[in-house]
Design a protein with these regions (language model features):
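Bacterial Sec-dependent N-terminal signal peptides
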Residues: 1-21
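Polysaccharide-binding surfaces and accessory modules of carbohydrate-active proteins
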Residues: 22-27, 31-35, 42-254, 270, ...
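Carbohydrate-binding surface patches
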Residues: 30, 223-225, 233, 630-674
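Short Pro-Gly-centered flexible turn/kink motifs
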Residues: 102-108, 274-293, 718-726
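Aromatic-lined carbohydrate-binding/catalytic grooves of carbohydrate-active enzymes
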Residues: 314-454, 463, 468
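Active-site neighborhood of glycoside hydrolase catalytic domains
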Residues: 384-386, 418-420, 424-578, 588-593, ...
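C-terminal beta-sandwich/jelly-roll accessory domains of carbohydrate-active enzymes
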Residues: 657-726
Length: 726
């Protein structure tokens, strides 16, 4: 008996020693996230920061950083996935009500494994409760060259009946610094990407939305963190973070009693106490983050490179320029007028004509936004030959054809609503609130998923030459009640988004090379999960070039230019067509304008600008972006793109509202080859106009251009210059 006891004790000691020595490292070329198992088997974050070069240093990292404090084991360190109802007094990563009503959970380390994935390494850590058959798997994918990490979690169980999840975070990250500065982004219709910087103090700050169909409107699903000082462009320690979830999201930033910051990205638990059945797996959204000691610019470029290579649909492919009819015609068009616009698109030089809203429904024709949504057949009175006739006309004109859809929505005045009122999110016993005169389909319902998939599949099956979809989503969820979920409404918000994923996965599997643009009341859907299925997104319905400069500056922190749709329109006609075009050319250029209203010189200009853009596209869409002069810090803005081989670059310079006799500073470029000689040539000039820039046509070394720079700003409102360096 004595020997048995000694053997058991030895085994326990061995187990404890094994746990104590267990170190898990998630690493890029510049960043380390290090976790360590405590003697009692709990998992703690012991380090997140610059990559440590000496492996022996990891042994010196302590899990019990607050060992002198009172309290239980969780309070002594930074538990990787803190639970609720047990020892931690701050915001948890996960909270569960077990099948028997118990609200406590303790997670212990079981195992970890690493495997190679495209571009990086995935680490999977398994945690388990010792009392209840509950398992949490933590996933981390590290992309070494891009210095980007994405993280998500999976929750499952084998209890006798369903458990309730009321917190379900993607991950939990800890930081220790003297000060923390959060820049989050608020928004509204036509006011996307408005930054607001706050120093975080002891306590909790929450950024969230409750919109249902989109992540963004009042708040955006991305943020910046500056450590010790507000995040800067080219210096200082920063983190950029974003969550991939086109629904209700929540960022929690909590500074505890000892000054440590925990960052918790998650689905918003609002109205979402989720019933999880035994054997099912609850998968959280991906949280993507990049850290840098050299400011936001470097972190952004890393995110851009990662996104193009590993996340965005056709991220390394080309993008189509297009002419949209919306601001030209609105709902008032017919087949003949569209055929003329297709000819205009060809003459302009763009790749495609995009037909916007108003082409569908017969019993209740789509004459305005009060009717027709849900009835996706061409209106015979407008388009007697339907989509096939439009595709034929586009071919005849020599351009591709794309089409607008809003398949997640329905008007009460539609045949679909008459046939399937049970497919609609709607409170049956209350007055109905309409958002843009429409309602949202309940895509948590598999039958509705089949219907939405069938819209795209039918169009593509009957018209395989359709080259592009603009997928809109103009309404948030109102009248919150899912006929499909009945008594289980807590699952609705989350299952609705998963239903959208199911539809998009089916579309992508069948049509993997089909470009699609996200649109949602402007820029309501800007997230990296949806971009797995879409090639680009619409930044904002605000196409005033002044406002677009600010919006595009903000969004470029997190998204590469090739994902950001920017159209030349008639908004703010007081600005020149050149200024409007130059602003849009710094992203994914397209047009939504009445070309026939342009003067002869303006028309010649936009034709040449399209050709110039085609030449510059490799730099803008694939190159490295450098934000040089912020519009938020003065009256001007400048950015440059540099090709990967540093042989070519393009500089965009904009004068917004300069002050009287304001002294002009040179713009110092970045990212060039210091030893290379670059010839500077201004492009996008009006017909017959010569460049008035002293630098035009001259040669400069990259070193000169980066240290001394070029005089490209003026004192005139709404002036722009585009310079190519090669």
């Amino acid at each position: 008996m004595k020997k048995t006891i000694m053997l058991i004790a030895a085994m326990c000691m061995t187990s404890a020693i094994t746990f104590a020595q267990e170190i898990i490292r998630v690493s890029t070329e510049k960043t380390d996230l290090v976790m360590k198992v405590s003697p009692k088997g709990r998992l703690y974050q012991v380090y997140l920061g610059d990559k440590l070069q000496n492996p022996a240093d990891y042994e010196n990292l302590k899990w019990d950083v607050y060992a002198a404090s009172d309290g239980a084991v969780c309070q002594r360190g930074h538990e990787v996935y803190a639970t609720s109802g047990a020892e931690d007094f701050f915001e948890p990563a996960v909270a569960v009500t077990h099948a028997d009503g118990n609200m406590t959970t303790y997670l212990y380390y079981k195992s970890s494994e690493q495997k190679a994935v495209k571009g990086g390494t995935e680490t999977v850590i398994t945690l388990q409760d010792k009392v209840y058959p509950l398992t949490v798997k933590l996933h981390y994918v590290a992309y070494p060259k891009e210095n980007v990490i994405k993280a998500w979690s999976e929750i499952s169980h084998k209890e006798k009946s369903a458990i309730t999840l009321w917190r379900y975070s993607s991950t939990m990250l800890y930081f220790k610094s003297s000060k923390y500065y959060l820049t989050n982004y608020h928004s509204d219709w036509a006011k996307e990407g408005q930054p607001e910087t706050t120093q975080l103090s002891t306590g909790k700050k929450i950024v969230d939305t409750k919109l249902g169909t989109r992540a963004a409107m009042q708040a955006e699903p991305f943020f910046e963190l500056g450590f010790d000082e507000p995040a800067k462009e080219n210096e200082g320690k920063v983190m950029l973070g974003t969550i991939g979830w086109p629904g209700n999201f929540r960022f929690t930033f909590e500074v505890d009693n000892v000054g440590a910051l925990r960052v918790i990205p998650a689905i918003n638990p609002y109205a979402s106490d989720y019933k999880l059945k035994a054997g099912e797996v609850f998968t959280t959204p991906e949280f993507i983050f990049a850290m840098s000691d050299n400011g936001m610019g470097e972190a952004s470029r890393n995110l851009h490179n990662w996104a193009r290579q590993y996340q965005v649909n056709m991220g390394m492919g080309d993008r189509l320029t297009l002419l949209n009819n919306w601001e030209n015609t609105g709902f008032d068009f017919n087949q003949q007028s569209l055929a003329e616009l297709m000819k205009d698109a060809k003459d302009l030089g763009v790749d495609m004509f995009l037909l916007d809203d108003g082409w569908f429904a017969n019993k209740y024709p789509r004459k305005d936004d009060h009717a027709g949504l849900g009835d996706w057949e061409a209106t015979k009175s407008k388009l007697p030959e339907g989509i096939p006739g439009l595709v034929r006309d586009a071919k005849k004109a020599g351009v591709k054809f794309g089409i607008w859809i809003e398949p997640e929505m329905v008007n009460p005045k539609s045949e679909l609503f008459e046939k399937h009122p049970d497919w609609v999110i709607l409170q049956p016993q209350r007055d109905t609130y309409y958002y843009r005169n429409q309602l949202v389909l309940d895509i948590s319902n598999p039958k509705v998923q089949d219907y939405v998939y069938g819209i795209v599949d039918r169009i593509m099956t009957e018209n395989p030459d359709v080259a592009y979809f603009k997928w809109d989503c103009n309404s948030v969820i109102t009248n919150i009640y899912s006929p499909y979920h009945k008594q289980n409404q807590g699952n609705f918000y989350i299952d609705h988004v998963r239903g959208i994923y199911n539809v998009l996965t089916r579309i992508h599997n069948k049509y993997p090379n089909l470009p699609m643009m996200l649109c949602s009341g402007g820029g309501g859907r800007m997230d990296y999960e949806m971009l797995k299925y879409f090639t680009e997104f619409w930044c904002s319905d605000d196409t005033d070039p002044y406002e677009r400069i600010y919006i595009q500056w903000s969004l470029s922190k997190f998204f590469p230019a090739k994902t950001m749709g920017s159209h030349v329109t008639n908004w703010n006609k007081n600005t020149s067509v050149k200024f409007r075009t130059d602003v849009c050319s710094s992203c994914k250029l397209s047009f939504d304008i009445d070309l026939k209203s342009l003067s002869a010189d303006d028309y010649k200009f936009v034709q040449q600008a399209v050709k110039n853009y085609d030449s510059m596209k490799p730099m803008i869409l694939e190159g490295d972006q450098y934000r040089l002069v912020s519009p938020y810090e003065g009256s001007h803005c400048a950015i440059n793109y540099v090709s990967k081989d540093k042989q070519r670059a393009v500089l965009f310079a904009y004068d917004l509202h300069p002050r009287y006799k304001e002294p002009q500073q040179n713009v110092k470029l970045q990212g060039l080859d210091a030893a290379k000689m670059y010839t500077v040539k201004e492009t996008n000039l009006m017909p017959g106009k010569q460049s008035d820039l002293e630098c035009n046509g001259k040669q400069y070394s990259g070193d000169y251009l980066m240290k001394i720079g070029l005089n490209v700003f003026t004192a005139q409102d709404g002036t722009s210059h585009v310079l190519v360096l090669e």
